[in-house]
Amino acid sequence: MTEEGEIQIFRALNFIRDNAPAYAKAKAERIYLENFRKSKKALLMRAAEIAGHKSAALQEREAYANAEYVDVLKALQVAVEEEERLRWLMVAAEARIEVWRTLESSRRIEKKMI
């Protein structure tokens, strides 16, 4: 492999290493928001009950319609988008490394055949 090709592989490895913390944080944020969404719904349903909505269906409707719940959903959307963006960048870097491994293996086999 050319020196430039090897440099690209090290860049891919460095990318994975350098972005692992950001990916972990994005994933943690997404998981937190998924669970917080449930807590927020419960809190909003309780507030709806106190406001006089006695059935669970009415409480749920009020919770889903609440602007605070919608804000949680928007934050979850952003968190999922960031997590997926980082994940696919990681997958691309891993694929570059796998291609390099395959090419290097083929190169070694060719050398043995000569």
Regions found by a protein language model. Name each.
Residues 1-114:
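Charge-rich amphipathic alpha-helical interaction elements
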